[in-house]
């Protein structure tokens, strides 16, 4: 394998079959890296540009019958310039440049208008002070995901999110690991606009 330029590779094959025949071949062109199980498109560690604004979405109690006393939330952070439509399933206008991240986390059920300060650990467990790992893919993502408008995306499979608060301002600092081992990190300090999608959708 030889890389030439602009993502182009030269792949040379020299295959010996069981019957003694040898097959020689060569391919020149683009090679898509990854496999059917790896969902990140990142190829190296990334520090997200400092977000300029964000939302705190209350999503209500867990819909799982066997999980009680847990509420679901999403912290949604966007860099300046991104246009987002919360009332249209959080659609983002795909023009220009920008980055955003969705962090799904869990609290005790008595939190319905704010989230407590603390350390939230990325995992699959739906319990307070945990954040849901990035799952899904191929058009149906849920959990904690990083995106940019240049078609990059990455699920968080481990890491942590630290939440602090001073008056109306939250501090959200995250250090996440994607499914290729890349680190994704950044932090935000400022207000988070509250959005109650649970009571809106159930009204």
Question: What would you call each of these model-derived segments?
Answer:
Residues 1-32, 126-200:
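Acidic, glycine-rich flexible loop segments
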Residues 25, 35-76:
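Extreme N-terminal export signal peptides that direct proteins to the secretory pathway
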Residues 1-2, 61-164, 202-203:
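Surface-exposed helix/loop patches within compact recognition domains
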Residues 33-39, 108-117, 194-200:
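Short, surface-exposed linear segments at secondary-structure transitions and domain or protein termini
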């Amino acid at each position: 394998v030889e890389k030439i330029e602009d993502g182009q590779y030269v792949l040379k094959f020299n295959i010996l079959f069981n019957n003694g025949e040898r097959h020689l071949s060569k391919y020149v062109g683009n090679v898509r890296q990854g496999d059917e199980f790896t969902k990140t498109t990142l190829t190296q560690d990334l520090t997200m540009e400092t977000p300029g604004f964000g939302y705190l979405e209350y999503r209500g109690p867990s819909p799982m019958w066997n999980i009680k006393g847990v509420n679901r939330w999403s912290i949604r952070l966007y860099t300046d310039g991104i246009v987002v439509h919360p009332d249209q399933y959080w659609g983002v206008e795909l023009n220009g440049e920008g980055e955003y991240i969705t962090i799904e986390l869990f609290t005790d059920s008595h939190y319905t208008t704010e989230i407590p300060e603390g350390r939230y650990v990325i995992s699959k467990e739906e319990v307070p002070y945990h954040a849901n790992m990035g799952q899904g893919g191929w058009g149906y993502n849920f959990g904690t995901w990083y995106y940019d408008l240049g078609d990059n995306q990455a699920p968080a499979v481990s890491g942590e999110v630290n939440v602090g608060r001073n008056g109306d301002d939250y501090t959200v600092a995250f250090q996440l690991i994607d499914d290729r081992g890349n680190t994704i990190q950044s932090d935000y300090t400022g207000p988070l606009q509250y959005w109650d999608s649970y009571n809106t959708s159930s009204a």
